[in-house]
């Protein structure tokens, strides 16, 4: 399993929501699929764009357990921006 960092812009009515997520997955495609399943409602939302990069815990210069805890905290509140269009 790899960890991927995704920035997802979702449009709903006149609002853009930006999600910043860390997803554990075997591939980029699996990470995107998980986002579709967990955060996206096809009936009322459209995806503007998705940026996916592979994330390495060593990029954070902390231990794996600390990185896992930080990632869990960040994923608990994934919507970081809402913008009226």
Regions found by a protein language model. Give the residues of each.
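Short aromatic-glycine-(Arg/Gly/Cys) micro-motifs in beta-strand/loop hairpins
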Residues: 1-18
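Intrinsically disordered, low-complexity boundary segments flanking structured domains
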Residues: 7-10, 35-41, 64
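Extended low-polarity, hydrophobic cluster-rich segments
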Residues: 7-8, 22-24, 52-55
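A short, exposed loop/beta-hairpin motif centered on an aromatic-Gly-Thr core
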Residues: 16-28
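A short, charged, amphipathic alpha-helix used as a generic interaction element across diverse proteins
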Residues: 26-48
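Short, mixed-charge low-complexity intrinsically disordered segments
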Residues: 40-85
């Amino acid at each position: 399993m790899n960890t991927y960092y995704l920035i997802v812009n979702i449009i709903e009515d006149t609002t853009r929501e930006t999600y910043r997520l860390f997803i554990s997955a075997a591939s980029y495609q699996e990470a995107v699929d998980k986002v579709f399943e967990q955060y996206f409602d096809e009936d009322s939302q459209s995806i503007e764009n998705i940026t996916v990069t592979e994330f390495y815990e060593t990029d954070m210069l902390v231990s794996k357990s600390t990185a896992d805890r930080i990632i869990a905290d960040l994923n608990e509140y994934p919507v970081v921006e809402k913008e009226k269009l």
